Amino acid sequence: FIESKSKSLKGNEDLLSVSEYTGVTLKQDNVGEDEFLTNAASLIGYKLCKIGDLVINIMLAWKRGLGVSAYYGIASPSYAVYTPQKEINSSFFHYRLRNEDAIAEFKRNSTGIIESRLRLYSDSFYALSIAVPPLDEQTAIAAYLDEKSEKIDRIIDTINTQIYKLKDLRKALINDVVTGKIKVVSGGVAV
């Protein structure tokens, strides 16, 4: 990877954000109804980010605040944007650089007075040595993890739907009991 210094000249590209939970996402997908996309007066000078670039929030690399971008857009000037110098599987690197071993290395090589002030500067990032398999193996690993992650995400969605329905059921039960639709007698329920 080599650090990209390209900056937005117009500031009209999609604004990207970096999350410890999801990696690089479109900022507009994470903005609530009453929130602003940004407080910045202008996005001119924000760092350009291409699909496949590694984007690191240097203040949160130790907390998994990084990811390989699936988007073309712009990122905060305080982020580091790195472009791969050889052919890589972006999905593999997204998984590899966000796993526990890599995060521990980022934390160990970050500088700062206290944990909440740690920063992973480019010279420290370049000094890291992370094992990387050949491209065909990267592709196989990424495909396997993508497939398994998709299945797990579907299960999580199903469980979350069930939880939502159970909460509704509880709400309805409470309403029915307190409004007298269901009569409760000592030691049990009388319908």
Describe the residue ranges of each PLM region.
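Short, solvent-exposed loop/turn positions at domain surfaces
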Residues: 37-43, 114, 157-160
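Generic structural signal for secondary-structure transition and capping sites
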Residues: 6-7, 102, 111, 171, ...
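A short beta-sheet element
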Residues: 46, 51-103, 108-110, 114-115, ...
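Amphipathic alpha-helical coiled-coil/heptad-repeat segments
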Residues: 132-191
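Short, hydrophobic secondary-structure boundary micro-motifs
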Residues: 10, 105-106, 185-186
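Sequence-specific dsDNA recognition surfaces
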Residues: 1-51
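Non-catalytic DNA-recognition/assembly elements of restriction-modification systems
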Residues: 1-11, 127, 131, 135, ...
